[in-house]
Amino acid sequence: MAPAIRQLATGLLLALSWAPTTRADSSAADYYVKSLPGQPAGPPVKMHAGHIETDADHNGNLFFWHFENKHIAQRQRTVIWLNGGPGCSSEDGAMMEIGPYRVKGDQLVNNNGSWHEFANLLFVDNPVGTGFSYVDTNSYLHELDEMGDQFILFLEKFFKLFPQYAQDDLYFAGESYAGQHIPYIAKHILERNEKAGPDDQWNLKGLVIGNGWISPFEQYGSYLKFAYEKGLLAQGSEKAKQLEQQWKICRKQMAVDIKIDISECEAILQKILDVTATLTTSGKRNCYNMYDVRLKDTYPSCGMNWPPDLTDVTPYLRRKDVTEALHINAAKNTGWKECNGAVGSAFRAHKSKPSRDLLPDLLKKVPITLFSGAEDLICNHIGTEEMIGNMEWNGAKGFEVSPGNWAPRRDWTFEGKDAGFWQEARNLTYVLFKEASHMVPFDWPRRSRDMIDRVMKVDISAIGGEPTDSRIDGEKGPVTSVPPSKGSNNHPDTKPGGGDKGSSTNDDETQKQVDEAKWKAYYRSGEIVLVIVVIAAGLWGWYIWRDRRRRSGYQGVAGGDGAGPGHRAGARGLDRFQDRRTARDVETGDFDESELDDLHVETPREGPHKEAYAIGDDSDEEDIKGKGPERSGTR
């Protein structure tokens, strides 16, 4: 090949690699999920799933599952969802809370409260070793800044694979121990943005944390207060006196050093569940469900058998046809586990300060929404409300709007039912969901979607939709959700009062407007790439023509030589009650998935790294002598 042509070929390859589709799109195709077993009839949801490497030295890969939005209202948005633990899979969120589908038996049904109505959803099993993610078993993470660094690397590679989402408005949402993860990730994103050019910054627009484990000081102090308020314990009783003594021990330890989890304080929750347990007629003990105190469970599980959907979700995610659809490696031996006890045991974060300390600085730049289910004990609303009341940010303390005056609690009604209240001041919003558990979207999917739509300032009138009847202080604003689809086989909202029910307004005209909005959102990037390809082809043809005229003996470009590159929700308590359903089951299989060119988005394969990996391993429910069951890693 003539030097001029060789130089041109090199230049064209570099130019094309710069274009936002080329290599990223061809690699993204490897992640495409064509369909899911048991998927309901109707328009399919566009999905991508698979692993992205975040630690090449220790075979660390994070698993993601991405769902494209149904509608685009005003602008593109992406919600990145994380569950708790540490070590509990975000498939809890995908399959039991905010994702497009719920599992019934071996089939999927539509979730009318799915948050993908107006936002792309990205679920990530975080940190490495959680759920379908994996890493060498001696390389679990220990601190929150380590986790934050790896998550930034994950996002860099994800947006390189899917550049069409890189400029979306980004919202991080999650629950429980994600109350630690999310603020740390946000801090790392803001630090990255300070160093990045204007066109390379990520549009972090908000953080949304439900029943979060954020401030150990207030949360540990709330256990007894919540037990008294709900009538689980009688204040002044002998049992209460025992627990007050344990609270004194806890406070003494916190006076020395406040860590993210403190065993002397974890014991308070364990003892509440122990002393309030009752004997059944069969001689077995029943205890309160720590995630929803309206319910009971067998002791010492105390909520680990909940939610009931888990009995269908676990076998579904272990099916071979499902793991193949999600691009999980065939060498995986034991299948998906909700929580990985080894991850939780390693991730003690003893050198990390509680994320509560990050909130005042974050609130200067990013709106934050905290929400609570009123019936959750383990990360209860009293602790969250007291944390807010004690915290100073943006020039004042708590929800104070002027000296001595606090922002009011504004009544929230949803389709005529009392749903809770909203309270907000200086970039912080608090939402209380009445009659809701630790997993609010599980109980009230459509109410939770109404919340996220308000947070994202969705105006569905932009696509011709009709808002559902959601009112704050009697006012019905435009930033609300659509009613559910008529006749769909949705997992219903089953709370007393009839749940969240409605009818569909998504007619053909609405769909037409939605399609037009999608086209406008993606048109520009496709047009740019098309222009580049046309120019490149024209230049290439001109050089070939000119060289053939100059060298009559030339027989073709490259002569066939192949020119160019060929190549859970966690919960805490009961002495590290952080891991739900914990059962040690360390993976020993290898992982052999396709390399993604120079992105190193890969999984381990045969060779020097053939050793033990952890992929969502976890331990079975065990009665730890003298402690009750251990959830080594989940809030």
Swiss-Prot record:
The EC designation for this entry is 3.4.16.6
Q: Which residues lie on this side of the membrane: Cytoplasmic?
A: 546-635
Q: Keywords in UniProt for this one? A: Apoptosis, Carboxypeptidase, Glycoprotein, Golgi apparatus, Hydrolase, Membrane, Protease, Signal, Transmembrane, Transmembrane helix
Localization of this protein:
Golgi apparatus, trans-Golgi network membrane
Q: Which residues are glycosylated?
A: N112, N427
Major place of residence: Golgi
MF annotations from Gene Ontology: serine-type carboxypeptidase activity
Q: Report which reactions are catalysed by this protein.
A: Preferential release of a C-terminal arginine or lysine residue
Q: What EC class does the entry list?
A: hydrolase
Where composition is biased (Polar residues), the residues are 482-491
Q: Where are the transmembrane segments?
A: 525-545
Active-site feature positions: S176, D376, H438
Q: Which PANTHER family match?
A: PHEROMONE-PROCESSING CARBOXYPEPTIDASE KEX1, SERINE PROTEASE FAMILY S10 SERINE CARBOXYPEPTIDASE
What is the purpose of this protein? Answer: Protease with a carboxypeptidase B-like function involved in the C-terminal processing of the lysine and arginine residues from protein precursors. Promotes cell fusion and is involved in the programmed cell death.
Q: What is this protein called?
A: Pheromone-processing carboxypeptidase KEX1
- Provide the taxonomic classification: Eukaryota, Fungi, Dikarya, Ascomycota, Pezizomycotina
